[in-house]
């Protein structure tokens, strides 16, 4: 019985430590790796995100946007080198962000979104060994 209570106490302590580190949504720390603050916008076959989405959509209707990292070849997903996250923006507004796990997650994400007006869809992907990479695609929204 004492051993069982001890294990339960350890589990509660671990949960409390995680909860204590959580920050309110408005106070989240910047997500870029501190030593890499500048976005890469030039093409790189292994690191540039590839956006697959329609060129034109109807206002307010849901559609899919698939972002994969490695426009020429897929980025690796290794313990020592992987893509931390893929984020999707409409112009400067972040729509969604998916965090990836090394080894178990391929750097490919499909988002389902709806837009009220056209603009640029921007995909940002941050690997562990460099600054984030960005690609954009114009999208037209019809009435």
What residue ranges belong to the model's regions?
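Short acidic/polar inter-strand loop motif in beta-rich domains
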Residues: 127-136
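Short beta-strand edge segments in extracellular beta-sheet folds
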Residues: 138-143
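Short, compositionally biased P/S/T/A/G/V-rich stretches that sit at domain boundaries
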Residues: 24-57
